[in-house]
């Protein structure tokens, strides 16, 4: 169920402060964050966020198409190595 429109999108306060400070200074430094739950808003466009995926920070450059999505959607947490191939020689013995 989506979030109520009267509440607006959720963005962590510390993240919003960092983006506003960079917008005032006209700088574009990487913003390191653990807040995967924050919704991307139009103020974030053009900024790069280092989103934590559980072991490292993944750089995410925000574009217009990402507005409305969560930061965590662009930093996958699981790595699929593939299924192990069946080794028939080892089974025959």
UniProtKB/Swiss-Prot annotation:
Q: Say yes or no: keyword Signal present.
A: no
UniProt cross-references to InterPro entries, sorted A to Z: Ribosomal_uS19 (IPR002222), Ribosomal_uS19_bac-type (IPR005732), Ribosomal_uS19_CS (IPR020934), Ribosomal_uS19_SF (IPR023575)
Disulfide-bonded cysteine pairs: these are none
GO cellular component terms, alphabetically, are: cytoplasm; small ribosomal subunit
Q: Which UniProt keywords apply?
A: Ribonucleoprotein, Ribosomal protein, RNA-binding, rRNA-binding
- Which molecular-function annotation in GO is an example for this chain? rRNA binding
Kindly list the biological process annotations in GO that this record carries.
ribosomal small subunit assembly; translation
Q: Which family does it belong to?
A: Belongs to the universal ribosomal protein uS19 family.
Described purpose of this protein according to its UniProt entry: Protein S19 forms a complex with S13 that binds strongly to the 16S ribosomal RNA.
Return the PANTHER family for the record. Answer: RIBOSOMAL PROTEIN S19P FAMILY MEMBER (PTHR11880), SMALL RIBOSOMAL SUBUNIT PROTEIN US19M (PTHR11880:SF8)
Q: What is this protein called?
A: Small ribosomal subunit protein uS19
**Which organism does this sequence originate in?**
Mycolicibacterium paratuberculosis (strain ATCC BAA-968 / K-10) (Mycobacterium paratuberculosis)
């Amino acid at each position: 169920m989506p979030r109520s429109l009267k509440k607006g999108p959720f963005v962590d306060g510390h993240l919003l402060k960092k983006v506003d400070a960079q917008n005032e200074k006209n700088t574009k430094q990487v913003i390191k964050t653990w807040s995967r739950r924050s919704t991307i808003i139009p103020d974030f466009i053009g900024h790069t966020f280092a989103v934590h995926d559980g072991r490292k920070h993944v750089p995410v450059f925000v574009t217009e198409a990402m507005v409305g999505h969560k930061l965590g959607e662009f930093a996958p947490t699981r790595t699929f190595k593939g299924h192990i191939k069946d080794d028939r020689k080892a089974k025959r013995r």
